[in-house]
Amino acid sequence: MSGAAERVEFDAFDLGAPDARAAVLCLHGLTGTPYEVRPLGEAIARAGLRAFGPALPGHLRTPEDLSRVRHGEWLEAARDALEDLRATHRRVGVVGLSLGGLLSLALAAEGAVDAIAVVGTPLRLRIPLLPLLPAVRRVKPFVRKAAGSDIRDADARARHPSYDRMPLASVEQLRALQGLVRRRLAQVRAPILVAHGLLDATAHPDDARVILQAVGSATREILWLESSGHVVPVDRDGPRLAAAVAMHCARFA
């Protein structure tokens, strides 16, 4: 795990009152940890809701562990966590960053949520030689993240705990999940907030526009974060994003 992990809270979190009227599931990104969505959870808890942020399968372990996880396992884990919240709360919402955003959209397409917010969600990968990925990963299964995480604030980037290697098998699983989500966007009906950093070098801003246009939600809003990269909750626009997400969840969840 790279980053100054010893100085930050990167484990799963459960914030706010257990008996709050509504609960929000907060889902992190690929190779990341709950740390990167914790600021959103803290704002949601301050708004009077419960916020639960689990670690997705293969995370908080090793890149090798992550490489063996299939996209259906991520979705099943997210679905189970949401069902647990639904069992004890009248209303539930879901918030996701990147991979977590894809999972949030998949859950919303199942009609399982009352509100949704997604951040930096990649509908497609824009990687050179992408069709060769299955062959490349057989000889080079991991790619080192030499530049660290896609965060524009240097101090925040240094603190950010994540794997320092990306399993190419996990990239293939991400692509499979992207295809599933693209096919189901029109089935998303819950009020949605789509947020995206304009300096995001991982997920193209066009993906945010496509999500906003393709979902079936009657209430939809887009929020552009001008000074942030991909991991917006811990980047320069983090406080602005957290306030918007908490307001959205408190209004609709």
Each language-model region and where it sits:
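Catalytic histidine neighborhood in serine/cysteine hydrolases
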Residues: R209, Q213-V231
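Conserved alpha/beta-hydrolase "acid-adjacent" motif
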Residues: A201-D207
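Gly/Ala-rich beta-loop-alpha elbow adjacent to hydrolase catalytic centers
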Residues: G96-G100, S104
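Conserved alpha/beta-hydrolase
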Residues: A45-P63
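Active-site nucleophile loop of the alpha/beta-hydrolase fold
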Residues: A117-I127
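Catalytic nucleophile-loop/oxyanion-hole region of alpha/beta-hydrolase
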Residues: T62-T88
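Catalytic active-site module of serine/aspartate enzymes centered on a nucleophile-bearing elbow/loop
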Residues: E226-A253
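Short beta-strand/loop motif that positions the catalytic acidic residue
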Residues: V188, V194-H196, D200
